[in-house]
Amino acid sequence: MKIVIGCDHAGYEIKQSVKLALRASLMKKDEDATHLQDIGCDSLDSVHYPEYGKTVADWVAAGTAHYGILICGTGIGMSMVANKVKGIRAALCHDVYTAMMARQHNNANILCMGARVVTPYQAINIANTFFETDFLGGRHEVRVLSLIHI
């Protein structure tokens, strides 16, 4: 599984925590930790979130990565940017329940979180839940296909 992660300045510190936890999780599963690609930002210096949101969404849409993670102050801006890219189903999740539902029912391919909304501990649990949850298919498949054709 290849994952690409990006953030703006508000999400930088939580991104670092999530990245470390996911790399450790991938290594426990005997997966290559280099399958987690960080595209920035790389500091607390102010940046424009659309640049990073679009890059992550483009990677996922092109198949360069299977999934993405985007973190900004609220998660709202990143989710808006990502969902403008064809083929992206970005979900703004603030807890493990919404992360689980985003995967099970909506086959979300990008997880968005708000660094001013969740703690680093919550963000790690949300990300782990997102990546450990499979799409249920069935009746949800029809709904996701309908969404794709809008």
Positions of predicted regions on the chain:
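N-terminal beta1-alpha1 ligand-phosphate binding loop
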Residues: 2-21
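Short active-site oxyanion
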Residues: 2-3, 65-68, 87-89
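A short beta-strand-loop structural module common to alpha/beta enzyme folds
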Residues: 33-46
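Charged helix-capping and loop-helix junction motifs
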Residues: 51-54, 93-95
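Short, structured active-site "lid" loops
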Residues: 52-70, 74
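Mid-chain, well-packed structural core segment of small domains
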Residues: 70-112, 116
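Short, glycine-/small-residue-rich phosphate/pyrophosphate-handling segment
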Residues: 96-142
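Conserved small/polar residues in nucleotide/adenosyl-binding loops
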Residues: 148-150
